[in-house]
Amino acid sequence: MEPIDPNLEPWNHPGSQPKTACNNCYCKQCCYHCQLCFTKKGLGISYGRRKRKQRRRTSESSQNHQDPVPKQPLSQPGGIETGQKKSKKEVESQTTSDQFA
C-alpha cells in the first residue's frame, strides 16, 4: 500500500478517483464506475436544479383572432313532447280569457 501524503486533500489521494471520466452511459459497468455514477445512474438520485416547466402563453395577436362563441338558444330537454306542446291559439285564448276574469 502506498503511503498517503498528508499535504494532499482527501479527494486528491491516489485511487480516490477512477482513471476514466464519468460519461452518460447507463450500462451496468458505467453505473458502478464511481459513487457519483452509482447514485445518479444506479439509484436515479440527482441533486441538481429542477427545471421549471414553462407554461404556454398565448400571444396578444392570437387572442385577437379568436371568434366569439355564438349564442344559441337553449335546447329543450328530451322526452315525450306531445303532452307539453300546446297550440298557439289555445294559449292565446287562455290568456285573453284570464285577462277579463
Swiss-Prot record:
Residue list for modification N6-acetyllysine: 28, 51
Region annotation (Interaction with the host capping enzyme RNGTT) ranges: 49-86
In-chain residues carrying the UniProt-annotated modification Asymmetric dimethylarginine: 52
A molecular-function term among this protein's GO annotations: RNA-binding transcription regulator activity
Residue numbers binding Zn(2+) 2: 25, 27, 30
Pfam families: Tat
Stretch list, region Disordered: 48-101
Interaction with human CREBBP, as annotated region: 1-24
Stretches the record annotates as Cysteine-rich: 22-37
GO terms for cellular component: extracellular region; host cell cytoplasm; host cell nucleolus
Site description Essential for Tat translocation through the endosomal membrane, residues in chain: 11
Record's comment on post-translational modification: Asymmetrical arginine methylation by host PRMT6 seems to diminish the transactivation capacity of Tat and affects the interaction with host CCNT1.
Record region (Transactivation): 1-48
Domain of life: Viruses
Chain positions of motif Nuclear localization signal, RNA-binding (TAR), and protein transduction: 49-57
Glycyl lysine isopeptide (Lys-Gly) (interchain with G-Cter in ubiquitin) cross-link, renumbered residues: 71
Record keywords, A-Z: Acetylation, Activator, AIDS, Apoptosis, Host cytoplasm, Host nucleus, Host-virus interaction, Inhibition of host innate immune response by virus, Inhibition of host interferon signaling pathway by virus, Interferon antiviral system evasion, Isopeptide bond, Metal-binding, Methylation, Modulation of host chromatin by virus, Modulation of host PP1 activity by virus, Phosphoprotein, RNA-binding, Secreted, Transcription, Transcription regulation, Ubl conjugation, Viral immunoevasion, Zinc
Entry keyword annotation includes Cell wall biogenesis/degradation: no
Residues engaged in binding Zn(2+) 1: 22, 33-34, 37
Residue numbers spanned by region Core: 38-48
Assembly and oligomerization: Interacts with host CCNT1. Associates with the P-TEFb complex composed at least of Tat, P-TEFb (CDK9 and CCNT1), TAR RNA, RNA Pol II. Recruits the HATs CREBBP, TAF1/TFIID, EP300, PCAF and GCN5L2. Interacts with host KAT5/Tip60; this interaction targets the latter to degradation. Interacts with the host deacetylase SIRT1. Interacts with host capping enzyme RNGTT; this interaction stimulates RNGTT. Binds to host KDR, and to the host integrins ITGAV/ITGB3 and ITGA5/ITGB1. Interacts with host KPNB1/importin beta-1 without previous binding to KPNA1/importin alpha-1. Interacts with EIF2AK2.
Family in the record: Belongs to the lentiviruses Tat family.
Misc remark: HIV-1 lineages are divided in three main groups, M (for Major), O (for Outlier), and N (for New, or Non-M, Non-O). The vast majority of strains found worldwide belong to the group M. Group O seems to be endemic to and largely confined to Cameroon and neighboring countries in West Central Africa, where these viruses represent a small minority of HIV-1 strains. The group N is represented by a limited number of isolates from Cameroonian persons. The group M is further subdivided in 9 clades or subtypes (A to D, F to H, J and K).
Record note on domains: The cell attachment site mediates the interaction with ITGAV/ITGB3 and ITGA5/ITGB1 integrins, leading to vascular cell migration and invasion. This interaction also provides endothelial cells with the adhesion signal they require to grow in response to mitogens. The Cys-rich region may bind 2 zinc ions. This region is involved in binding to KAT5.
Protein name: Protein Tat
Species the sequence originates in: Simian immunodeficiency virus (isolate MB66)
